[in-house]
Amino acid sequence: MNKLDSMNEIVEEVVKRIQQQQQNTFEVEASGRHVHLSRQEIDALFGPGYQLTKVKDLSQPGQFVCKERITVAGPKGLFQNVVILGPERSESQVEVSMTDTRILGINAPVRESGKTEGTPGVTLMNGSAVVTLSHGLIVAKRHIHMTPEDALKNKVSNSQIVQVKVEGTRPLIFDDVVVRISPRFATYMHIDYDEANACGLTKGARGYILK
């Protein structure tokens, strides 16, 4: 094999790999600030036994937007009409962007959902009802919800960290993206509004994992 043949093989392999990556694309969604509430906080904010009102399903099976809204407050500022996502959880959690943390005046860490140990608290308000969480404020780590079938196609494992190229008006490669695999999931990548603005995200935008 001469040098030209060898180069052609390398080029063909690279092209094949890129084509395979682009075939395994998934939709990228932007998540705005939102709250997950436990039964304890629901009772405190809305009254004992109150049931959250579902108004719209989300892309992840079983998760939904609630009609109810609350205020999230920090030492420097607050956000009104913050959406609550259901169903209720075992522990309350508030997810915001980096920009939001500066407005609130609270230095929240980047964490995976549910990993709230050692995170700062924040105040939740609904009218005269006020609850101050001891912890639970996070900036959500960018992540991909993935079915086991799509994980096989993409050759990734649960909790693996990958790079993702997001196509759009400002194409961008996101590093440090965690893959979360479950048969309960639908395959979508989630980023926050800061990240969405950085890549000029539009509805229906897609991304793919880089190897």
Swiss-Prot record:
Zn(2+) 2 binds at H143, H145, H190. Keywords: Acyltransferase, Cytoplasm, Metal-binding, Transferase, Zinc. Its cofactor is Zn(2+). Its main location: cytoplasm. Pfam families: PTAC. There are 2 Zn(2+) ions per monomer; Zn(2+) and CoA bind inbetween the 2 domains in each monomer. GO terms for biological process: propanediol catabolic process. It is an enzyme of class 2 (transferase). Phosphate binds at R89. It catalyses: propanoyl-CoA + phosphate = propanoyl phosphate + CoA. One of its GO terms (molecular function) is metal ion binding. It comes from the Bacteria. Zn(2+) 1 binds at H34, H36, E95. GO terms for cellular component: cytoplasm. It is found in: Cytoplasm. Formed by 2 beta-barrels, each is capped on both ends by short alpha-helices. This is Phosphate propanoyltransferase. It comes from Enterococcus faecalis (strain ATCC 700802 / V583).
